Amino acid sequence: MTLMQGRHAAERSPTHRLGFTGLVVLLLAGTAAVASWRFGIFSGASPEPSARDGDPPSAPTDPGEASPEPSPSPSSTPEPINTGIEGLTTFRGNATRTYHGRGPVPEDPEILWRYPTSGGLCGQSSDAAGTRLWCGTGWTGQPNVVEWEGRIQIRFGAYDYAVHVVGGRNGRALMEPFRTGDLIKGTVTSDPDGYPLLYVGSRDNQLRILALDRGRTMEELWSLSADSAPDPTWNDDWDGSPLVIDDYLLEGGENSWFYVVKLNRGYDGQGRVTVNPRIRVMVPGYDDELIAALGDEQVSIESSVAFHDGVAYFANSGGLVQGWDVSDVLLGGDRHRRVFRFWTGDDTDASVVIDEEGYLYVASELERLNGRSREVGQLMKLDPRKPKDPLVWSVPVPGEGGAGGLWATPAVHGRLVIAPTNTGRILAVNRNTGRIRWELRLPPPTWTSPVIVDDVLILGDCAGVLHAYDLSRPGREPPELWSVQLEGCIESTPAVWDGMVYVGARGGAVYGIGDRG
């Protein structure tokens, strides 16, 4: 990505790339060698895995008659993925990235607290433009909201290299910040089943699992380096919000690999939470056909994995959208195969959104200006049941003197798809026909992914204003209900919960916004 420097890690030096077939062969290398390699990439893993969980990941195969158990699926009223706690525990709340939070939405809000109370959450980091100061929270940066031990906890990562846990009512720190080695840009994930665990990626190469039951201190239980993949590419960040399905973690990295990790969660004799992770699936997010079409190796995975009916969907910065059937793996087996492939032509960092009928909504950027981008547009609806011709409709989203397309993840609401664009156009598209019903204009770039709760659309702009619009009559341009001025461009996605809105901005702070009294 080249347009905005606030999102991306420094590019890797060019590396020799194995072909897709060669990668599969590599994964099938001798058992002893693979086992040795796998133990070398973990910290905190047991040296004596179970027979099944200790096996190396197998190459993609046809799952045959494997029948998945019912999976977290969309409905006309999306529900959170959580089974053990109340809250918003991952980016967009569930496996289909369609749960936006819980009302009521505030009616006349103001800033009730700022964290920190003064100064900012800032850190030095380097990218292609050099070393500079980054502040606040970025893309996607949606706070987790978790009801925990009688309190509302707000959990998030920030540009000061740290994970923070603060009180939802007053913004006071509830735990000591956990320091990583670089910026945290993505949305952290709280364990949806109630284990005191937090899953977080950082720009320091590491995907981590943190324990939250050690008093006021978060403790690292496990980490996975982006550089441990056989052929890491492009970047070493982990922007995607990890997805936990039962006892499995699904995640894509900017090293362009997709992982399914068996967590083996539990508790020790002292009642402290434990994990014993094992990689069950590890496949590249690209293939030879994509590299040939692109002519370069910019193929990192920055989207958050979506999941429906046993299939994990994700996209990469080369525009490749994939669906991998991992149903057998989630039942304890090894078989997995790619069942869906679609090329958008350009960088696709927004997460795939899945509606209640199983359709996919995909948003791509417009930077390469190639023939494929012109052919399929930048906002599209796909039918994965028709893998040879999945495009249902598409909407072109041109630039205005610069890059076009979308960085934000669209929101599905009733008959509409709400899609903020890089140029500041907020599009409302009929999700059946693909026709634009209405649009708004906000100061660009609008990277914040919209959230909709109780027919109220909430999103931020790059002038630092958080807006709320009335969507109760979706066929008309919505009137603005209120706005709140924050400090700095709002790239992060808001979280709505019980009368409060929580969001960070590039000015350096995270805010609690609600009605006074």
Annotate each language-model stretch with its function.
Residues 16-18, 35, 94, 255, ...:
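Alpha-helix initiation/capping motif
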Residues 2, 37-41, 479:
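Intrinsically disordered, low-complexity segments used for protein-protein interactions
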Residues 41-80:
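N-terminal low-complexity, Pro/Thr-rich disordered segments
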Residues 12-44:
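Hydrophobic single-pass membrane-targeting/anchoring helices
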